[in-house]
Amino acid sequence: MAKLTKRMRVIREKVDATKQYDINEAIALLKELATAKFNESVDVAVNLGIDARKSDQNVRGATVLPHGTGRSVRVAVFTQGPNAEAAKAAGAELVGMEDLADQIKKGEMNFDVVIASPDAMRVVGQLGQVLGPRGLMPNPKVGTVTPNVAEAVKNAKAGQVRYRNDKNGIIHTTIGKVDFDADKLKENLEALLVALKKAKPSQAKGVYIKKVSISTTMGAGVAVDQAGLSASAN
């Protein structure tokens, strides 16, 4: 049996795995236990009452968190003409068509998000094997294929998170950094849960949001009591 590190022993002593914590208590606990030498992300896992084996019950989308994620995001946009100028004005680092595709084919991928206008998908389609495995392929379901590329760039820069359930029906994403004020982390979590509720498949039956847990990059998960969240989020 592997020996527990001092850090993990402390976490096990502090976190009751059988308890659901009030959101404020949960955030305070994460902050107390975040002893890594970098500013850890605060991540969330949401267990959904869906059958992930059925395509009509899968949940996928994007939402802009009110206080962002604390990450700086580099954006690449496939578009042309007036849209190209609008994308640059909105803050996109890379804008182009075939020239941008050629850069990517050479392995030059210094970006975190890819956005495309519909007319550019003929070019982006050639990059599916490169962008797809990295989760970067533009998709209208998450707002990254859109005629309004400038708005999409602004959303990405403002702290938009994309979400998609895994094979176990769990959503994993980030809601900020551990140095965020507790209120900001709480409001970001509530905004995410509101978005997930709006994305509930009509075929999903029973309890939809079954469990919510938050953790830091290097920490253990802390289960959150949804009763302590705003009415619209629980």
From Swiss-Prot:
GO terms for molecular function: rRNA binding; structural constituent of ribosome; tRNA binding. GO terms for biological process: regulation of translation; translation. Disulfide bonds: none annotated. The keyword tRNA-binding applies. InterPro entries: Ribosom_uL1_bac-type (IPR005878), Ribosomal_uL1 (IPR002143), Ribosomal_uL1-like (IPR023674), Ribosomal_uL1/biogenesis (IPR028364), Ribosomal_uL1_3-a/b-sand (IPR016095), Ribosomal_uL1_CS (IPR023673). SUPFAM superfamilies: Ribosomal protein L1. Keywords: Repressor, Ribonucleoprotein, Ribosomal protein, RNA-binding, rRNA-binding, Translation regulation, tRNA-binding. CDD domains: Ribosomal_L1. Pfam families: Ribosomal_L1. It comes from the Bacteria. GO terms for cellular component: cytosolic large ribosomal subunit. The keyword Methyltransferase does not apply. HAMAP family: Ribosomal_uL1_B (MF_01318_B). NCBIfam families: rplA_bact. Part of the 50S ribosomal subunit. Belongs to the universal ribosomal protein uL1 family. Binds directly to 23S rRNA. The L1 stalk is quite mobile in the ribosome, and is involved in E site tRNA release. PANTHER family: 54S RIBOSOMAL PROTEIN L1, MITOCHONDRIAL, LARGE RIBOSOMAL SUBUNIT PROTEIN UL1M. This is Large ribosomal subunit protein uL1. It comes from Salmonella typhimurium (strain LT2 / SGSC1412 / ATCC 700720). The lineage of its organism: Bacteria, Pseudomonadati, Pseudomonadota, Gammaproteobacteria, Enterobacterales. The gene is rplA.
